[in-house]
Structure formats: C-alpha cells, structure tokens
UniProtKB/Swiss-Prot annotation:
Binds 1 zinc or iron ion per subunit. The keyword RNA-binding does not apply. Belongs to the metallo-dependent hydrolases superfamily. HutI family. Its cofactor is Zn(2+); Fe(3+). This is Imidazolonepropionase. It comes from the Bacteria. The lineage of its organism: Bacteria, Pseudomonadati, Pseudomonadota, Gammaproteobacteria, Alteromonadales.
C-alpha cells in the first residue's frame, strides 16, 4: 500500500456511530493516512502489507487516538479583561446588574474598539495555541465585541487571518447582535436595522463569516429582533445559530428550530417544548459548563430531556472575558460530567462528532472514518474516560492535522 504515514500500537476511539463498541472503540488497532485523509483503519491484525522502509511509522505505545477536538463556541478574540467584574460578582452583583450598568460585554467592546488588528491577532494566537496544545484542531470564533461596523469587521478579519496562519481550522461567526451598544441604548430596533442593512452586507462582501448568531435574552435582543437578524442571514445563505435560554426562557430555541438553526447555545432554561422543537429540526444543543460554573448558576440544562428526545449534545468552552474566561476544552470534558452529569462518552462526543454537526462539517471531521480529514490526537491514557476524569496534566502527545504531524 502507498500511504503517507501509518500509526500502530494504538487504540482508536473513532466516535463513529456505526462501530457498536463504546466510543466507537477499536483496540489493538492501526490507522493510515494518505493525502491528508484517513486511508485505512482497523485492527492491527488486518493491516495490509506496506513498505515499512519508505512509509513513516509512528508507534503509539498503547495510547488512544481520538478525532481532533472541536471547540464549537468561543469568543476568542478580545482585548482587556474583566477581573474587576469578577470581584463585583463575588460581592453580590449579578451578571444582569453588571450588564445594565454598561459593564459586561460593553466594557470589552470599549477595549476592542481601541485595539488594532495586530494586537488582537497576537492575543488570539496565544489563546489558539493554548487550545491546540489540548488537541483542538477546529475552533469557532465569534465577533460581538465591536457593536459597530468597523470593529465587527476588524474582529472577523483577525479571525480569518488566524485561520490562515495557524494549523487549527477557524470557523467564523458574525455576532453583531451580542448586546445593545451605548449609542443605541434607547433605540435597539435602530441597532437591528444597522446590523441588517449595513453590518451584514459588509461582512458578506468580505466573506468574513460562515454563520450568524444572536444573543436572544431579556438583557439583549427580543424574539422579533432575533428573527429579523437570523432571517436576513439565512436569506443571504449563511448558517444561523443562537444564544438562548441562558438566563430566562424566552422561546428562542423554538424560534431557532423553526428557522433551521445549526445550534442553540447555553439553554439552561430550555423547557420540554423547546427540546422537542430542537429534536424535530435536528438542531444541536450546545452546553457551556464553563459559563455555568464561572457565573455560579444553579439552573442546569435539561440533560435528561435532551437524551430522551435524541438531541445532539455539544460541549464547548464559551471562552470569553466575562462569563467563561477558561481557555480549556479538557476542563469542559470534566465539567460536562461533574456539573451536568454527562457520561464521559457523551462529553467526548460533544467535543468531536456533535461539535462537527453544530458547525455543519460532520461530513469531513468529528470522527475517525475512512475518507474523512486526517485530524486526530494521540493521548497517553489507558481509557478514553480518563480525558474527562482527570485534569491538570495534559495527556495530549501528538496531533495530526490534515495528515501532518503538527504537535509532538
């Protein structure tokens, strides 16, 4: 066989639903790569003969290979920090109190408007490096810290540039409807007009976004405003997604399902009717335990209902300066299990196959299947459950991206 590389002495957590074992596991396995794609995988005993003198062979020392991790919800590009608000919350202030006092998102908006692209790029690069060291091979990055046309475009340009200069694939999301900027404090409908009539066309003209998101909440955008933005995005041919049911149940998830959104994110206050709507539309539920933890929330997402209705559950970091300043997908695996009672297999599926579904890229990444992109990680673990069980010592040994060894 003519391959570019072969990995032996490994176990595979394929996350392929067609493999009946937990995690889609194949033990005592091998995997071969050709032209950036998975060319063969299976039990080592069935590995076809190949020229060991001309093809690089990597020995996994009994470790586990999983698909590359996918962080499907981040706000990774921002300037400044909000440590002062952390102190205020510990003294009793709520997330809503801080937001209504022009803190929260608005304070980060001010910092991002002042920062130039070079500064934002370097900050983003450092954060992307941190995720990459934990086995992340694809990441979604949202705008939303500009709230004016110039700064929203600036953030999205930086995200696109990161994708060009880093081995991690970057998917971009336009989140101009993240908060009401001070200039439109008493005219939120006017700001929605600006998003639809000026911001969105400018984003599309530069091909800066793969999707559009809205924060549908009582401190942000109502249902009517949310539908206007998402409908405009959908009409322009962009994927849509939604922050919804984080602080209250406004019915955003049902709206997102009706419009065919790829995902609804947060969903702590989602009810059974909303879960049923997601199930019927095939919309993913993105769980963000980092924000739940950092904001010290008590209302948990309806995990049992999501299971009952077969809604794909995704785990993501929600890395951002205000509600989840936690740049770690491995910690999300642990939090998803300890805080939300996911099984370790559900958690890993949420950072691989289901995360790919939330971004609309499941045909190419998210599981180890012949013909898919060769994005995978070798972990120094005895069982896949260890990835969720223990945190603090990074077990990621090797990362292959598009068939190339990028981290060793």
């Amino acid at each position: 066989m003519s391959w570019d590389q072969v990995w032996i002495d490994v176990n595979l957590a394929t996350m392929d639903p067609s493999v009946s074992a937990p995690y889609g596991a194949i033990t005592n396995a091998a995997i071969a790569v050709k032209d950036g794609k998975i060319a063969w995988l299976g039990p080592r005993s069935e590995l076809p003969a190949f020229d060991v003198l001309s093809i690089p062979v990597y020995r996994g020392k009994g470790g586990w290979i999983t698909p590359g991790l996918i962080d499907a919800h981040t706000h990774l590009i921002f300037a400044g920090n909000r440590a002062n608000e952390f102190e205020l919350r510990l003294q009793g202030a709520s997330y809503e109190d801080i937001a209504r006092a022009d803190g929260g998102i608005i304070s980060t908006v001010k910092a991002c408007r002042e920062a130039d692209e070079a500064e934002l790029f370097e900050l983003g690069r450092q954060r992307l490096n941190a995720l990459a060291k934990e086995g992340v091979t694809t990441v979604e990055i949202k705008s939303g810290y500009g709230l004016d046309t110039e700064t929203e475009l600036k953030i999205l340009r930086v995200a696109r540039e990161l994708g060009k200069h880093h081995h991690v694939d970057v998917k971009t999301t336009f989140l101009g409807a993240h908060a009401i900027p001070p200039e439109y404090k008493d005219n939120s409908d006017g700001y929605v007009d600006l998003i639809i009539n000026k911001m969105l066309p400018a984003v599309i003209a530069e091909n800066l976004a793969d999707a559009v998101d809205v924060f549908c909440e009582n401190i942000a955008f109502n249902l009517e405003q949310t539908e206007r933005v998402l409908s405009a995005a959908k009409a322009a041919g962009l994927e849509i997604k939604l922050h919804a049911e984080q602080l209250t149940n406004m019915g955003g998830s049902a709206l997102a399902a009706r419009l065919g959104a790829k995902s609804v994110d947060h969903i702590e206050y989602l009810d059974e009717a909303g879960v049923k709507a997601l199930s019927e539309s095939g919309t993913c539920a993105v769980l963000l335990p980092g924000a739940f933890y950092f904001l010290r929330e008590t209302q948990k997402p309806p995990i049992d209902l999501l299971r009952q209705y077969g809604v794909p559950m995704v785990l993501a970091s929600d890395f951002n300066p205000g509600s989840s300043p936690i740049c770690s997908t491995l910690l999300m695996l642990n939090m998803g299990c300890t805080l939300f009672r996911l099984t370790p297999e559900e958690a890993l599926t949420g950072l691989t196959l289901n995360a790919a579904k939330a971004l609309g890229i499941e045909d190419n990444v998210g599981s180890l299947v012949v013909g898919k992109q060769a994005d995978f990680c070798l972990w120094d673990i005895a069982t896949p459950a260890q990835l969720a069980y223990s945190y603090g010592v990074n077990p990621c040994k090797d990362v292959v991206k598009n068939g190339k060894l990028v981290h060793q």
